[in-house]
Amino acid sequence: MGGCVGAQHDSSGSLNENSDGTGVALGRNQPLKKEKPKWKSDYPMTDGQLRSKRDEFWDTAPAFEGRKEIWDALKAAAHAFESNDHELAQAIIDGANITLPHGALTECYDELGNRYQLPVYCLAPPINMIEEKSDIETLDIPEPPPNSGHESQLRLRLSTGKDLRLVVRSTDTVFHMKRRLHATEGVEPGSQRWFFSGRPLTDKMKLEELKIPKDYVVQVIVSQPVQTPTPVEN
């Protein structure tokens, strides 16, 4: 992405240098191919996790290199491409003067020669997609024995912007920690997605198995507004 002005990319044939020294996309501009990329995620991914990964890319990519209007066009084209509206995707690409040397959105150039690369997860879901866990599926997660394991505080950062420390036990599963968070913050367990070092945590994982370093911040994506918990009568 970016940094292509004045550069020559004869090996790929995607860029050439004009006599005035300006690198522009020339030749090998192929129509957008209809075939969607097939790929497998490093871990089984839910629809919600895929959406979060895409949102993270589109929120950060334009901040580094390239032109915002081109990123906006590529986002719209990617959405049309995945929705099988191939004609609209091609019209968006042509309207923004975007060149596709290989007929794919994974490598694109604008008219100034800036390079843009879209990851495959923005163009198609992985072949190992899984369904979101339902409340029924979580019923088979056994309760840990009372007062088992050792108590500690886990640092959480909610997508709402709130940081907090949650009292947990080492034998807790992720699902039981979600229930603890629900009791303190009013966020339904089914509306929480937990991430540790960028990896999604499944409900059956145990805290003691995750080996989360002390004071490490666990990210919690909340998919609904946080509700104020109802006070409990003593």
Swiss-Prot record:
Pfam families: UBD, ubiquitin
Compositional bias per record (Basic and acidic residues), positions renumbered to this chain: 32-41
Cytoplasm as UniProt keyword: yes
Segments for region (Disordered): 1-46
Cellular component, GO, one term: cytoplasm
Residue ranges of every copy of the Ubiquitin-like domain listed in the record: 152-227
Biased segments, Polar residues type: 9-21
SMART domains: UBQ
Bilayer-spanning residue ranges: none
Top-rank taxon, per record: Eukaryota
Cellular compartments annotated: Cytoplasm
Principal location: cytoplasm
Keywords linked to the UniProt accession: Cytoplasm
Protein name: Ubiquitin domain-containing protein 2
Organism of origin: Mus musculus (Mouse)
Gene name in the database record: Ubtd2
